A protein has these predicted regions:
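Catalytic alpha/beta core domains of metabolic enzymes, predominantly
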Residues: 153-154, 158-212
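Non-cysteine beta-strand/loop elements that form the S-adenosyl-L-methionine
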Residues: 68-77, 113-117, 200-207
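Distinct, well-ordered alpha-helical segments
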Residues: 30-31, 61-66, 124-133, 158-170, ...
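Active-site mouth loops of central-metabolism enzymes
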Residues: 1-4, 47-55, 81-86, 118-132, ...
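Glycine-rich, positively charged N-terminal anion/phosphate-binding segment
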Residues: 2-47, 53-61, 66
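Conserved anion-binding
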Residues: 77-143, 149-151
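Alpha-helix-loop-beta-strand connector modules within alpha/beta enzyme cores
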Residues: 27-51, 91-113, 160-180
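Glycine-rich, proline-tolerant flexible connector loops at the mouths of alpha/beta enzymes
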Residues: 15-40, 73-88, 118-124, 149-160, ...
Length: 212
């Protein structure tokens, strides 16, 4: 069913799909077939197959299987990062550095993207300072990642604070590296998309029927 879904989406002109995740099977068993799915996705013409990874181990597995793009995830919120990947934020950034360095030594390099989750707030610790997010943006930009996904993981963003943060992110990393991920928790998902479009960013990370 997963492979059938991927083929159908590619026919609808989606150029990039996050096809699977290389995460511990004991924690997220539904990705037990990650290797099979990635191998099949790589056969689809005109599709960039990206893979979510939480650590260096997962990244190495994905790169060994020729993942065209690595989506590494960390959180601006310390509490959320600890709950999600069992690390503090600095440790996650250090591990991202290891992934970038590992990828650079490969004969066939993949694109490295990092998602900064809880960029507008956290369900565990509440408000997340824009300064914290911008500090992370500076660090990951310096590491040489190809893309940065500013993610409103819990849907706390509004057009005002979205524009404020993205303007400063653009100053650090430029428009070409940046894309956005919004949730519609408070009915502001589309309004936030428009706010970012007005700044000249045209790439968004989305899901199908709320799944993904």
């Amino acid at each position: 069913k997963k492979i059938k879904w991927l083929n159908k989406q590619s026919l609808l002109n989606f150029k990039e799909i996050e096809v699977t995740s290389f995460v511990p099977k004991k924690i997220v068993p539904q990705f037990f077939d990650a290797k099979i799915i990635l191998n099949e996705a790589n056969k689809i013409s005109n599709l960039t197959s990206s893979v979510l990874v939480p650590n260096l181990f997962g990244a190495k597995k994905a790169l060994e299987l020729n993942a065209q793009k690595i989506n590494y995830v960390l959180s601006a919120s310390e509490s959320h990062n600890k709950a999600n990947v069992n690390k503090d934020v600095n440790s996650s950034i250090n591990e991202l550095n290891e992934i970038v360095n590992y990828n650079n030594y490969l004969e066939k390099k993949s694109s490295i993207s990092v998602a900064i989750s809880t960029s507008f707030g956290c369900s565990i610790e509440g408000k997340v300072s824009p300064k914290k997010v911008l500090n992370i943006v500076e660090q990951v930009t310096h590491l040489g990642v190809d893309e940065i996904n500013i993610a409103d993981t819990v849907g706390y963003g509004n057009p005002y604070n979205v524009k404020y943060l993205f303007k400063h992110v653009i100053e650090i990393a430029g428009k070409d590296k940046i894309f956005a991920h919004f949730h519609d928790t408070r009915g502001l998902g589309l309004a936030n998309v428009i706010a970012v479009l007005e700044l000249g960013i045209f790439k968004f990370d989305s899901s199908l029927c709320g799944l993904g």
